[in-house]
Amino acid sequence: MATGSRESSFSSCASSCDFDDEGVRGTCEDASLCKRFAVSIGHWHDPYIEHLVRQSKERKAPEINRGYFARVHGVSQLIKAFLRKTECRCQILNLGAGMDTTFWKLKDEGLLPNKYFEVDFPMIVTRKLHTIKNKPLLFRPIMELHPEDTLQIDSHMLDSKRYAIIGADLRDLSELEEKLKKCNMNTQLPTLLITECVLVYMTPEQSANLLKWAARSFETAMFINYEQVNMDDRFGQIMIENLRRRQCDLAGVETCKSLESQKERLLLNGWETASAVNMMELYSGLPRAEVNRIESLEFLDEMELLEQLMRHYCLCWATRGGQELGLKEITY
């Protein structure tokens, strides 16, 4: 939840585009380290992240750790609500997944969808696949669901019965669709698409095209988006300047003006319902016992900074179709 969040996905461009994307790719590393640290001090349970992400050499600030807790909790609640509504007869597309461990955690909980897809930069995918192949704790659960002799895996792609990891470019929708279909994406299944701090690194036109593609590709679908909001104020401008100093441009920041602008772009690009909440509101609505547990882990002397950070990130979700499943009823 820090001012430069995370995992984005666009790759095979010209060399100038690759240079522009370098800062964006770096946000994957930043977010992964923040999550690993928060897990290491007990904010949430994730036995897999330590096998994918090295431990940070520096301690992360308490407000950052609480922000990541709220992010992981909110996204997880929406994912599980979708899985319950569809009784897991669905598929999930995590676009810009980075070092995400959701596949393994859902398997442990008996909540795997028909198939779980991840898409990210080929460079990030290569690193993740190399780690998976060399860590039995990560590789074994995949093989338990798939006959070994038919597993497809190379440096940029893994395709198994229940899990696929794909290196692709979200700005090239024909390439994206082709690669997903090669891994048996089923457009007839209820589909959940997830982006976390991904759309903000695309131009408004590029992110609109992705949202339209998602809306028209699946009859029954839900879209979850986590990213910045309220970026017109002074605190938002400081966030933008900090990222620019790291060669990371928020190309889509104009869509992050308010919760209303976030919902509006979903509705304008083919989605039938749209909801949004800033992360301070979400955090404030957590069960008191859970908040007390989180706040007992570390002392925070500036509550105002936490509130400022939380008010500049939001969780949005949209649905299309699925009336018989009750998708419109889903909330965090």
UniProtKB/Swiss-Prot annotation:
Transmembrane region(s): none
GO BP of this protein: methylation; negative regulation of protein-containing complex assembly; regulation of apoptotic process; regulation of glucose metabolic process; regulation of mitotic cell cycle spindle assembly checkpoint
A GO CC annotation given for this chain: cytosol
Protein name: Leucine carboxyl methyltransferase 1
Family: Belongs to the methyltransferase superfamily. LCMT family.
PANTHER family recorded: LEUCINE CARBOXYL METHYLTRANSFERASE, LEUCINE CARBOXYL METHYLTRANSFERASE 1
Key words, A-Z: Methyltransferase, S-adenosyl-L-methionine, Transferase
Catalytically driven reaction(s): [phosphatase 2A protein]-C-terminal L-leucine + S-adenosyl-L-methionine = [phosphatase 2A protein]-C-terminal L-leucine methyl ester + S-adenosyl-L-homocysteine
GO terms of molecular function: protein C-terminal carboxyl O-methyltransferase activity; protein C-terminal leucine carboxyl O-methyltransferase activity; protein methyltransferase activity
Enzyme Commission (EC) number: 2.1.1.233
Positions annotated to bind S-adenosyl-L-methionine: 71, 96, 120, 169-170, 196
Enzyme class: transferase
Organism in which the protein naturally occurs: Rattus norvegicus
Gene3D superfamilies: Vaccinia Virus protein VP39 (3.40.50.150)
Pfam family, one: LCM
